[in-house]
A protein has these predicted regions:
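Short beta-strand/loop segment that forms part of the nucleotide-sugar
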Residues: 204-206
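Short beta-strand-to-loop acidic/aromatic patch adjacent to the donor-nucleotide binding site
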Residues: 1-9
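Conserved donor NDP-sugar-binding/catalytic core segment of glycosyltransferases
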Residues: 9, 13-45
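Acidic/His-rich active-site region of diverse nucleotide-sugar glycosyltransferases
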Residues: 31, 35-66, 110
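Short secondary-structure boundary/capping segments
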Residues: 7, 17-21, 43-53, 121-132
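Structural preference for long, well-ordered alpha-helical segments in enzyme cores
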Residues: 14, 18, 30, 90-101, ...
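Conserved nucleotide-sugar donor-binding catalytic segment
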Residues: 55-141
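N-proximal low-complexity "stem/linker" segments adjacent to membrane-targeting elements
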Residues: 141-198
């Protein structure tokens, strides 16, 4: 199953690239890099989104996968595709749920999805759908609860309202290793250590 918007454009060879990964690696969830463009000219690019490979912590904080998602139908068994509770961020919710179930997630590192930017589209600005931010936080919170996390906080970062900072509850009393890059600057090192000893609220460090 592949999901894309009706007014966007796919690279002519994207299906070939995906089928190749399915045949060679047994991929059951795939995505690629993407670009936004304006008007009807894909050469008028506004942004180019070169994505990392699958990283669950990153995905919780930021729906970097977005387009062009293709996945095995078996991942939907017993699942809803889009949940109305997270309207505006239903793609983030869906991606979190399906990647949880996937056995082989493959990132095709090529610009193969062209996302049309127009008024009223989140490709142009998240301001077009301000409710999407709270919906995305709700989707991430639901995902974290399913993974057993409790007492966490999800806030938007200053960089972008849709990129979140997740503060997790610290479990136990883990030792923190403090590494100070210092060579031949004894006074600077002394000042750093004194500051740590004076101001730190955490006692278990080395």
């Amino acid at each position: 199953i592949g999901l894309f918007d009706q007014d966007d454009i796919l690279h002519p060879s994207v299906l070939y690239a995906y089928v190749k990964e399915i045949n060679e690696q047994g991929a059951d969830y795939l995505y690629c890099d993407e670009t936004t463009f304006k008007e009807n000219d894909i050469n008028k690019m506004l942004t180019m989104h070169f994505k990392p490979d699958y990283a669950p912590d990153n995905l919780r904080a930021n729906n970097y996968i977005c387009h062009f998602s293709v996945f095995s139908r078996k991942l939907l068994e017993g699942e809803e595709l889009f949940r109305t509770a997270f309207d505006g961020a239903q793609d983030h919710d869906m991606i979190l749920r399906l990647t949880d179930r996937a056995e082989k997630i493959v990132h095709v590192p090529r610009l193969m999805y062209y996302w049309r930017s127009h008024e009223g589209s989140t490709a142009a600005s998240i301001d077009a759908k301000p409710y999407a931010i709270e919906a995305a936080k709700g989707a991430v919170a639901d995902h974290l609860k399913k993974h057993g996390f409790k007492h966490f906080q999800i806030t938007s970062t200053r960089a972008c309202a849709t990129i979140f900072r997740i503060r997790y509850q610290i479990l136990g009393d883990p030792k923190i290793s403090i590494v100070i890059a210092n060579k031949d600057h004894v006074e600077d090192l002394k000042r750093c250590i004194t500051s740590i000893q004076k101001n730190s609220t955490w006692s278990n460090y080395e």
